[in-house]
Curated annotation (Swiss-Prot):
It is an enzyme of class 1 (oxidoreductase). This is GDP-mannose 6-dehydrogenase. Coiled coil: none annotated. Keywords: Alginate biosynthesis, NAD, Oxidoreductase. NAD(+) binds at Y10, V11, D30, K35, T86, T124, K271, R331.
Amino acid sequence: MRISIFGLGYVGAVCAGCLTARGHEVIGVDVSSTKIDLINQGKSPIVEPGLEALLQQGIANGRLRGTTDFAEAIRASDVSMICVGTPSKKNGDLGLEYIESVCREIGYVLRDTTRRHTIVVRSTVLPGTVKNVVIPILEDCSGKKAGVDFGVAVNPEFLRESTAIKDYDQPPMTVIGELDSASGDILQALYEELDAPIIRKPIEVAEMIKYTCNVWHATKVTFANEIGNIAKAVGVDGREVMDVVCQDKVLNLSQYYMRPGFAFGGSCLPKDVRALTYRAASLDVRAPLLDSLMRSNESQVQNAFELIEAHDKRKVALLGLSFKAGTDDLRESPLVELAERLIGKGYQLDIYDENVQYARVHGANKDYIESKIPHVSSLLNANLQQVIDNADIIVLGNRDEQFRALALQAPAGKQVIDLVGFMNKPTSTTARTEGICW
């Protein structure tokens, strides 16, 4: 494949070396004549183990060359990869001036070409950037239509400095965000020899995946550091703690708890977060990430309330009251907190929870229900169908399988608010569904 790479910094130079090593013809493009001279001499413009050998090989076999001539590189290639930097502005926003400049250059050249060209954004950009910035510039400068006259895709990179060659050759996954299937097909062909799953998604999803991965990595580092600081303050080696924590691949390092949805609750998590952050504060150990957990959890309850409030209807069915399905435990259930807010704002609320109904009469939580939340428990209704029929808004609060079946057959005319991820789309033309995070 003939590929032009715009930007010969860290990402661009690594991609150039790895692509030529796999037999592709690559033209490296940069405004810096110094970088171009280095590339054409087979020298790496960055420090990265193994890269210079790949560049030397590419120059020697004629598959790699560098140029400052944007137009010539575009005309001589079928795919253009944008790998320019996206530096932070003073306010923290993303600087897109380099991407905008490259897109203008590409667009002007496309105006005079008849071959279909595919533009691939490898630079890290926020969701909506390709749709709202890249494509409009390309279309305006070329006079052509994206997805029809030329292709557009996003291909986020997951290269780590000092291990970039290995990361390119052995990725955990290859993410392709495609505007049109033809562009996705081209990138899939480019990467199909790599032993990694190829995941094709809409462009905005691919953009968000990249940021989510990076922020998750930053979160893990910060979490481990804060745990380590608290551990040291209580006379424990934080490394020993985290070594054991990381051995749990069922809960700690897994997909469990990693699905967007409603707030956490129950008798353990809220209590233990508060206890540990209190101890940290008493020892003068700063733990801003851990300190933020309860505030963030509270914010998710408020988000759910605002979803309901936005629909200007007063009859609400809350399906689920315990903090999770399969239990009658109401201690610190975020659904109880949500119910309290709805009651306080004058909503007509009916609640259905099979396990809590049982507990109300027989269970160990009977005293808790009657003493702590009698005003909420009085709204419990044992007739699920009646609860649904009386409501304008149906809130799916926990993952009881009864509610999944209901979600798939949502009554026409009802507004369904899904807090747990049962529904992907409305079940009829008149049923409406909205998820808390989707």
